[in-house]
Amino acid sequence: MSQNIRVVITGMGALSPIGNDVKTTWENALKGVNGIDKITRIDTEPYSVHLAGELKNFNIEDHIDKKEARRMDRFTQYAIVAAREAVKDAQLDINENTADRIGVWIGSGIGGMETFEIAHKQLMDKGPRRVSPFFVPMLIPDMATGQVSIDLGAKGPNGATVTACATGTNSIGEAFKIVQRGDADAMITGGTEAPITHMAIAGFSASRALSTNDDIETACRPFQEGRDGFVMGEGAGILVIESLESAQARGANIYAEIVGYGTTGDAYHITAPAPEGEGGSRAMQAAMDDAGIEPKDVQYLNAHGTSTPVGDLNEVKAIKNTFGEAAKHLKVSSTKSMTGHLLGATGGIEAIFSALSIKDSKVAPTIHAVTPDPECDLDIVPNEAQDLDITYAMSNSLGFGGHNAVLVFKKFEA
């Protein structure tokens, strides 16, 4: 167990397929709102995939100057909007006296895919001189962190983690450790992604990762029979985390405490999880060891649960192997059933869900739960939110490349 500085969550910001802020996103999650619909951003006629979780009624020019927005890929735009909400929510004052002790650590799994597509077309059609000088700064995944730090003036530890679908959770975990060891007083952290593009849809389709089901009510159905892949989503989930001393000194509202972080590698396959979910199991155990708790102490687990045939089953096996008899009493829901899979942003959104579950004593459901897979026989909180007094919550993220990341959150007690 870490005997270091206590770290708490004091601010949250979200853009998701079920809401353009934290309040709306959480309310809709508890209502079981389905954010998945037909893709509008691109013409999907040539593709086998036609559904995604897109943002609704969102205009970037309501948040960022048009000229500046044109110099950022969507994933960076989303990060700035969510980070501003989180900092405002935390009432965090970033000024010349505090800036050096406030850092930014925001990840993106694939970075500026739309920017790449546009630049490639310019190169092929008109030659190298027509490629924008902003191409590289718009493309690279670390630019969400860079632009957020510039926008907010945060000059502390600054970096970006890229671990595919585990990116958001790894980012929060690394930021947690930065604060825990005293290298910063506060960190703005999470994940962001804008993957609804021609190349991303084509690429993930080619790897057979995406659902080809055109029924919005059954395309994303984690832990159910007949599931055939994940549904892409977009957005950003950003937290302000800080030392308990800093939070208490300024009278900040505290949502929950972060007490554990575990991360492992499968060393098995570029896309498939290790047999029996072995790597994920080790990450869950590492996170509990870091928190100094046992399986029986955890009441809720926000699962990775992407709705892939192999992934869901392996995660269930990993949970059973890790929790043993305690798995029978554990609430396990996949909020991706509502949002779709936001890739690098998903860990940020699901950290928000986990913390708010603790704060509000409510667990968001796994919707579309109508044909349970008998091998995925956990309590997945089917279709309707449940009231639950939670002391400890866990959030899992598992990514291509064998990346496994797990966070443990605790109800705050002074």
Swiss-Prot record:
Catalyzed chemical reaction(s): a fatty acyl-[ACP] + malonyl-[ACP] + H(+) = a 3-oxoacyl-[ACP] + holo-[ACP] + CO2; (9Z)-hexadecenoyl-[ACP] + malonyl-[ACP] + H(+) = 3-oxo-(11Z)-octadecenoyl-[ACP] + holo-[ACP] + CO2
Coiled coil: none
Membrane-crossing segments per the record: none
Pathway involvement of the protein, from the record: Lipid metabolism; fatty acid biosynthesis
GO molecular function, one term: 3-oxoacyl-[acyl-carrier-protein] synthase activity
Any Gene Ontology biological process: fatty acid biosynthetic process
Keyword Lipid biosynthesis: yes
Key words, A-Z: Acyltransferase, Fatty acid biosynthesis, Fatty acid metabolism, Lipid biosynthesis, Lipid metabolism, Transferase
All copies of domain Ketosynthase family 3 (KS3), residue ranges: 4-411
Taxonomic superkingdom: Bacteria
EC numbers for this chain: 2.3.1.179
InterPro entries according to UniProt: 3-oxoacyl-ACP_synth-2 (IPR017568), Beta-ketoacyl_synthase (IPR000794), Ketoacyl_synth_AS (IPR018201), Ketoacyl_synth_C (IPR014031), Ketoacyl_synth_N (IPR014030), PKS_Beta-ketoAc_synthase_dom (IPR020841), Thiolase-like (IPR016039)
Example of a GO cellular component annotation carried by this entry: cytosol
Active site (catalytic residues): C165 (for beta-ketoacyl synthase activity), H304 (for beta-ketoacyl synthase activity), H341 (for beta-ketoacyl synthase activity)
Family matches, as SUPFAM superfamilies: Thiolase-like
Main EC class the enzyme belongs to: transferase
Matching NCBIfam families: fabF (TIGR03150), PRK06333.1 (NF004970), PRK07314.1 (NF005589)
Family recorded in the similarity comment: Belongs to the thiolase-like superfamily. Beta-ketoacyl-ACP synthases family.
Function: Involved in the type II fatty acid elongation cycle. Catalyzes the elongation of a wide range of acyl-ACP by the addition of two carbons from malonyl-ACP to an acyl acceptor. Can efficiently catalyze the conversion of palmitoleoyl-ACP (cis-hexadec-9-enoyl-ACP) to cis-vaccenoyl-ACP (cis-octadec-11-enoyl-ACP), an essential step in the thermal regulation of fatty acid composition.
Protein name listed in UniProt: 3-oxoacyl-[acyl-carrier-protein] synthase 2
Species of provenance: Staphylococcus aureus (strain MRSA252)
Taxonomy of the source species: Bacteria, Bacillati, Bacillota, Bacilli, Bacillales
Gene that this polypeptide is encoded by: fabF
